[in-house]
Amino acid sequence: MSIKSDKWIRRMAAEYGMIEPFEPGQVKQKDGHSIVSYGTSSYGYDIRCSDEFKLFTNLNSTIVDPKRFDSNSFVDLKNDICIIPPNSFALARTVEYFRIPRNVLTICLGKSTYARCGIIVNVTPFEPEWEGYVTLEFSNTTPLPAKIYANEGVAQVIFFEADEVCETSYKDRKGKYQFQQGVTLPKI
């Protein structure tokens, strides 16, 4: 299994539609202002979050149960920024839509710009033949409110090409998060 380079990422985006919209270079400025970078890096792709957020709230004072998750635990927000309360979290989705080839698995890691501020980005692997917008999880580990910027970089996707094609892909298993379009809550 090998990590794939910028050349491979560009080729797969062009020929396979692996990432849409796709940025072949690194974008570090917008309208003359510095932003958290996004686009193709040496051995990965820096993804952006859209302006669609689900902000966790404890207004209903419920127990967080992944098997019976209460959607009323979130407040929907559409904005250029999302302020996450102390020790809380928010969900968002990527700007980019992904189509993962059958012989590829990805790992996604948060950008250091956010990590150095106590904001942790968690994303599970994109499995072979998974397709959709990625749901992003942001945890504010600080005792202060934390800001997330829409349409800027939040995490890096690293692509691994397998030595052998898997017998059963995410698509074959009819994975429950296949073709997700928006911010997707837990499913069982």
From Swiss-Prot:
Alphabetized UniProt keyword annotations: Hydrolase, Nucleotide metabolism, Nucleotide-binding
Catalytic activity: dCTP + H2O + H(+) = dUTP + NH4(+)
Location of the active site: E137 (proton donor/acceptor)
Residue numbers binding dCTP: K111, S112, T113, Y114, A115, R116, T135, L136, E137, Q156, Y170, Q180
One Gene Ontology MF term: nucleotide binding
Enzyme Commission number: 3.5.4.13
Domain of life: Bacteria
Principal EC category: hydrolase
Cysteine disulfide partners in this protein: none
One GO term of the biological process aspect: nucleobase-containing small molecule interconversion
Pathway(s) the chain acts in: Pyrimidine metabolism; dUMP biosynthesis; dUMP from dCTP (dUTP route): step 1/2
Family membership: Belongs to the dCTP deaminase family.
Physiological role: Catalyzes the deamination of dCTP to dUTP.
Record text on subunit structure and interactions: Homotrimer.
PANTHER family assigned: DCTP DEAMINASE
Protein name: dCTP deaminase
Organism name: Nitrosomonas eutropha (strain DSM 101675 / C91 / Nm57)
